Amino acid sequence: MDKKTKLLSKKVARIRGLIQAIATLLTNIHIPNLLKGKIYQGKIKTVCVPGLNCYSCPAATGACPIGAFQAVIGSSRFKFSYYITGFFILLGVTLVRFICGFLCPFGWFQDLLHKIPGKKFSTARLKPLRYLKYIILIVFVILLPLFVTNSIGMGDPFFCKYICPQGVLEGAIPLSLGNTAIRSALGTLFSFKCLILITVVVLSILFYRPFCKWICPLGAIYSLFNKISFLNIKVEGSKCVGCNQCSKACKMDIDVCKTPNHPECIRCGACIKACPKDAIQYQFLGKTCPKKEQQQSTITNR
């Protein structure tokens, strides 16, 4: 990769980080509530946000789609929601895992952790663990809330309650710091969830986005739409020289030339930045997103 490409890569990487920061702020706009130890409960809280963001976070703007999905499945009255299902389909078809790469607060949290200096390890040999998130989706998000119910027919949100580290990071910890009653009620389950959070934090420092790759059920849902979405990655075979720089740059362990729109692709753009021949580009609705150089050429020729 030449000096110019490296500079461009760094510039785009900074822009992506800025987008992630803005998305996280908009998803958690009620920051003063963090000091008060109470949850925002306005009308907009019924609207789902695109990424994994705990409803119980005092600063949260909206609802977590996975939490809302479990609430419906575990309800004694309703087992299906056109709103939640439509939400997943709409975002899945339009943005897919671009949400994971640019808009998810917990994805950004893992990115920041991975920037901590130290030895890093590849997850290429751990690819079978990718399927774990689909098992978690089916078992903890769907089956357990649906069939393991109490005396009045209500099921617990098993993923949120027993697995999700975001709930501890954004919900339990800030709420307990600002509310004495909640702090005194914390018990074994909180300790167990803290252990999960610590494990994810340590793994995120060593590996790139372990939670996204192996555990996240929201990523599992969005991945189902990766090959049919409006937003995809286009590899121009006529320009590709087979240098494999794109796959080397991909931290999601994808063979970009063979499967550019693999279910694991989070549309981060690392492969686009790494390609020395400009053979890889974003496409939206079949139209290639013009690069800066192409736009300048078009203006010059007018």
State where each predicted segment sits.
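Non-ligating segments of multi-cofactor redox enzymes
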Residues: M1-C257, P263-R302
